[in-house]
């Protein structure tokens, strides 16, 4: 009997960047400039971000989306989370934002490097995993007045919510999240010194 060849499927849509509106005001005057509240972002204290908690918040929100669309929840996978964290850290430390590293390695390479095997058959196709990435920020906006920066900081909850909202508004990322055959995911977060929050999501 002839053997049917199975197709292989790797899924990685383009990365998503949440942009920060920047404003700058520079004044030259003899007297100190009064601080007008309507010129400045809403004053919030700088958030304390617990990366592990943020990852779990994103994971819970992802499962909320799946449940709302009649899908089963997916389990947290520590091995996938380690792979995701490594990619988020690599993007932050080497100043790039892409599924492929500067050496041209995509998530399938990262799975193999860590000894992670993903193979989910559906019909004639074997799905080998998927990846979403997003670049978020610690703050919504920054206004500089006479050289002094005023930040509208984001809370940890808001970072999680805007991350999932951003993915769900992007067709490719949304499709990855809502694919019915995934059973596991890992979320990896790394915060760069400049306030950029790199987030990687890996599926199997």
Region annotations inferred by a language model:
Residues 29-30:
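N-terminal Sec signal peptide cleavage junction
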């Amino acid at each position: 009997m002839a053997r049917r060849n199975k197709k292989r499927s790797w899924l990685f849509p383009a990365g998503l960047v949440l942009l920060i509106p920047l404003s700058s005001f520079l004044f030259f005057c003899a007297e100190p400039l009064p601080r007008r509240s309507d010129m400045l972002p809403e004053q919030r204290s700088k958030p304390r971000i617990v990366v592990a908690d943020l990852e779990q918040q994103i994971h819970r929100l992802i499962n909320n989306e799946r449940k709302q669309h009649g899908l089963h929840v997916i389990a947290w996978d520590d091995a996938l989370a380690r792979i995701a964290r490594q990619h988020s850290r690599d993007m932050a430390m080497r100043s790039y934002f892409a599924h492929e590293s500067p050496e041209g390695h995509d998530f399938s390479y990262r799975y193999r490097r860590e000894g992670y095997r993903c193979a989910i058959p559906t019909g004639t196709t074997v799905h080998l995993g998927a990846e979403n990435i997003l670049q978020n920020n610690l703050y919504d906006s920054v206004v500089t007045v006479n050289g002094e920066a005023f930040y509208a900081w984001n809370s940890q909850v808001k970072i999680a919510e805007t991350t999932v909202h951003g993915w769900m508004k992007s067709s490719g990322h949304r499709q990855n999240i809502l694919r019915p055959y995934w059973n596991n995911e890992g979320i990896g977060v790394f915060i760069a010194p400049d306030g950029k929050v790199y987030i990687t999501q890996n599926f199997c």
